Amino acid sequence: MVEQDFNLLPEVLDGVSSSKAAIRYGCAKVLMDLSEKHPEKLYPHMDFFTALLDSNYRILTWNAMAIIANLAKVDEDKKFDAIFDKYFGFLNDAYMVTVANVVGNSAKIALAKPYWAQKVTNELLKVENISTTPHLTEECKRVIAEHAIKSFALFFDEIEQKEKVISFVESHVDSPRKTLGKTAEEFLLKFR
């Protein structure tokens, strides 16, 4: 509905603050979808989404991560540059889904802002060293590594330190997580 009438956008933005979960998360999902199709319409609200990174509701934080990554391609004012460290600081979060959201959205940022590709690469290579927690196990780390390889594949042409990425990927070929091993093998067939 908002896609047909962007005058409704302020109401959807307000809905993210609703005390009712269904409204709050429904509105956030609408905004996430809109950010993919019409990032230019949401870009004037970039500060709103940046503030959502600090939400008490993890789901809103995850939505904000995706939205911000989608807005990177229209970020003429370089607002993302000011929050790069904050955004990628979530790689140290105790929750696997939070870390996976950063990793999964990283390629969008690297492609939208090629001058960040090396720094994004460095951040993604750090996933090897994230700490385990009750919400981020060794198996979770393997899932995150798989997401990192998929992200690298999307912007590999922009990466200067290709050998470091290849080494990272090679270290996962024999992973006990079958899909990680397969993803690593496919990456190496394509890029090595």
Can you say where each PLM-predicted feature lies in the sequence?
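Non-membrane alpha-helical segments in proteins
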Residues: R24-L34, D47-F48, W62-N70
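Amphipathic alpha-helical scaffolding segments comprising HEAT/armadillo-like alpha-solenoid repeats
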Residues: E3-V16, P39-L52, D77-F90, P114-S131, ...
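Acidic, Ser/Thr- and Gly/Pro-rich intrinsically disordered linkers and low-complexity segments
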Residues: N129-H147
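Hydrophobic, well-structured mid-protein blocks that either form specific transmembrane helices
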Residues: Y57-N105
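N-terminal alpha-helical scaffold/docking segments in eukaryotic complex subunits
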Residues: M1-K37, F152, I166, P176-R192
